[in-house]
Structure formats: C-alpha cells, structure tokens
C-alpha cells in the first residue's frame, strides 16, 4: 500500500478514530488504527468492540492495500511531522515507511486482515437531526449519567422516540435530566439505551452546525451515527430503562422564577470556602419573596438543602436567562423546567442540620 495526503487531513482523521481505541486490551490489534486503501477512498478505522469509528480522508492512492498501525505511535508521529504532504508506504512483513519532507519513520505494522471491522448494519429509515441539536441535547443531559459501572443502565442515556418527539433521559440516582426535541418526521415508537461514553465521543466529533445533519440508525443491539465523512457504530446497553414517570410531578407548593446567572453567581460565592470533596449542602431559604437575591415566588416559604454541584450542573446548560424552580417540601425533589417542558431537571434534596 502507498498513499499520500496532507498532514491536516491525516491529523483530523486520526483524531476522530482515536476516540475508539481502547486504553486497555488483551488484543494488540485493537490498539491499532486501520488504514484501508483497497478501494478508491482512504478510510481510517478504530474499534474497541463496543465503539467503532470510521472516517474517510482526502488523499491520493498510489498503490492499493491496507495496514494496521499502532494508534499511539502513529498519532504521535503524524502530529510532529511538518505541515506538508505525508507519504505512507507499507511493504514486506508490514514494515511501514512514513515520510514527510526530510522526516522519515520506519515502524512495524500488522495485517489489516486481522483487524476487527465494524459490524455491518443495514441503514434504512434513518432519523435525521441537525448536528447542532444533537450536540446540544448531549451537552444538556450527559452530566447526570453515573460515572461507575455499579448499574450499567445509569452509565447510558435513554433515547425514547415516539411519533415526532425524541426524549433523551439520563440519571445517576441523585438527579434526572430530560431533554425533548421535535423531529421533522414521525417515527415508530422505540426505546434504546446508548452508552454515555459513545455520546461523549460523538459530541466531540460533531461540527455543531445547524445546517449539517446526522443520521441515526437503530438495530436491536447497535446504534449508528452517520455524518459528514464519519460513521460511528456503538453497541447498546441491554435492559429496560428506569420508569421515571412516577418520579415526575406537576404538583408544587412553591415556585421560584430567578435570573439564572445571578443564582449561579450566588451559589459560586456560597461555596467559595468549601473544600473540594466536602459534602456540604447549599441551603436555600425562600421567604417573603426573597432568596437572598431578587426573585418572583408563589406559594409557601421553604427551607431546603441541595448538593451545590447538582444545581450548578443543571443551571449551566439552560440557555434561558431565567429559570423556574418548583418545590413541594424539604423532602421532595426540586424541578427546574421551562413552560413547554423541553427540558426538565429533577434534583433530590439532601438532609442538613442547624438553623439558617
């Protein structure tokens, strides 16, 4: 195999597929990036058996073939080469010569035939969403997935499609994030759980442009994201997602409308002297139209405590200038939501002692 391409194109491609290279594996071939130039395009692929990414880069094929190269070594070499044309040539025993101007690197590769290809997925009836919308939905929900594997379902997000509405849900046992968007077309009801790791990596690759679309394809075991010159294939998390409907309520005793930025600044100041790792709650005292800053409130006075990080995480991803907070009592969850409920954040309170 012999190909040539610009450094900028190769760096971009390697950066995209490297997100699917495992950090630990007992299979050395999975630590590689496959360069496939067996057809008329140059395709880079990485696959950790749970997440696979494939992207096409611009370039010229002088001699068709394929080679698998160690991802870390290959990435380091490519990034440090001059900003010019790079030539990659593989020969006997998979020895590979990488040349750019006066720089030359000779590294050992592996047979492309041994590489674990992405599973074949029939791409029919795609769900189309703008890259901007999907990137935003992930940003506004991903922070409340669980960060450990004690409950696998909590490490993913529910994609609940019904008609022309897509609802994305995440939870970690202390909070729930829900984001609803309207789709351009109507689809059959479908519920799947997508790994949080997959969504984080997809979000990094998405351009975020409103006029560029990403197409989603679903099977019983996989989800496919197809956009630009890239395809991401991920295994789904098995199992039935949590029934959150019984935790959601429109009843409230106290409603507060507040400037989001002012509340964030207030929480930031209140936690200024709290050491990182200390589990001290922030106490919210709502009384006589006051919450230590100007608010509009309806209903009963209230004294309630929350983990400040959970409040900050939710408020930071809300784009509206003002936020509505709904409370029932000091033992019930707080809801942050807009009137149309395009977003809903549920946060459980924490116990505290002492007068405020």
Report each predicted region and the residues it spans.
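Structural preference for solvent-exposed beta-strand-turn elements
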Residues: 1-356
């Amino acid at each position: 195999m012999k190909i040539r391409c610009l450094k900028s194109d190769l760096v971009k491609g390697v950066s995209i597929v490297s997100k699917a290279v495992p950090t630990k594996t007992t299979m050395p071939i999975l630590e590689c990036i496959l360069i496939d130039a067996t057809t008329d395009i140059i395709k880079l692929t990485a696959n950790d058996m749970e997440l696979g990414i494939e992207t096409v880069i611009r370039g010229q094929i002088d001699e068709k073939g394929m080679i698998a190269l160690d991802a870390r070594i290959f990435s380091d070499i490519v990034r440090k080469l001059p900003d010019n044309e790079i030539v990659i040539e593989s020969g006997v025993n998979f020895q590979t010569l990488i040349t750019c101007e006066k720089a030359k690197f000779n590294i050992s590769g592996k047979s492309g035939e041994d590489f674990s290809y992405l599973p074949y997925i029939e791409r029919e009836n795609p769900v189309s969403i703008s890259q901007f919308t999907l990137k935003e939905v992930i940003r506004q929900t991903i922070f409340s997935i669980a960060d450990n594997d004690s409950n696998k379902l909590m490490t993913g997000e529910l994609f609940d499609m019904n008609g022309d509405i897509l609802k994305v849900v995440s939870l970690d046992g202390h909070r729930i994030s829900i984001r609803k968007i309207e789709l351009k077309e109507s689809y059959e009801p479908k519920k799947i759980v997508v790994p949080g790791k997959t969504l984080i990596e997809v979000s990094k690759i998405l351009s975020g442009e409103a006029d560029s679309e990403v197409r989603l394809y679903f099977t019983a075991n996989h989800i496919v994201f197809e956009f630009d010159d890239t395809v991401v294939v991920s295994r789904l998390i098995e199992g039935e997602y949590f029934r959150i409907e019984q935790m959601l309520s429109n009843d409230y005793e106290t409603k507060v409308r507040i400037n989001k930025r002012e509340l964030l600044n207030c929480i930031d100041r209140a936690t200024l002297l709290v050491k990182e790792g200390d589990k001290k709650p922030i106490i919210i005292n709502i009384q006589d139209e006051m919450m230590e800053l100007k608010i509009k409130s309806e209903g009963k006075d209230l004294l309630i405590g929350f983990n400040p990080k959970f409040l900050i995480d939710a408020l930071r991803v809300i784009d509206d200038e003002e936020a509505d907070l709904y409370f029932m009592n000091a033992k019930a969850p707080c809801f942050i939501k807009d009137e149309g409920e395009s977003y809903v954040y549920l946060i459980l309170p924490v116990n505290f002692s002492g007068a405020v």
